Amino acid sequence: MPITLDEALVFTLKWEGGFTNNPLDPGGPTNFGIIQSRYDQYRKSKGLSRQSVQAITKAEYTEIYDVYYWEPVRAKWLDGTLGLALFDTAVNLGVGGCIRRLQASLNVPMTGTWTNAISDVIHESDQLEVAINICKLRIAKRYDRIKERPDQRVFLKGWLNRDNALLRKVKSMGGMSVMAFEEDDDLDFDVDEIYNSFEPELLHEIERLDNLQGEKNID
């Protein structure tokens, strides 16, 4: 059963709420998960003057999430498990990075854009299984990111906690049991084990394409 954007935002905004401007984050100034350049793009499309993303309103960020993330990954047409996984991944890794991981999970060419090849197979697939695989590909990306940029290790715990929360959420939505933990940052998985479950060539190609597009929350 599909979920709504508002339902998806309940999860995503737990991780994206508030203003940040960490010099190590290539996204720069960010508020409610919306980076300044995306906000500039949105306001320009409305014929509005530029202003700091700190001033973004709920109506604005909700519309941005709808137009730039929810609609491009077609989340409203999919089972809620996959819809949530795609939406949150689009917000976290960019739409192109999200769709590449969907394409890798469906074993279709990785263009980074929605294609007929996706449409041809997605409704015949086990969408819960695809959602779980996308979560695992996110986790694997963290491994490559830290190898490429050791200074990004400061974000690793937060990334993995978010990935873990998403993995648990989609499993729960799909009727799978999840363990209760005493600590919020306990993980359900071993990062090395997940990383090594994928063919190295696949992970390297996804990362190469991510870097080629040079995206961080904006396409």
Task: Give residue ranges: language-model regions.
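Cell-wall polysaccharide-cleaving catalytic domain and substrate-binding groove, primarily
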Residues: 1-219
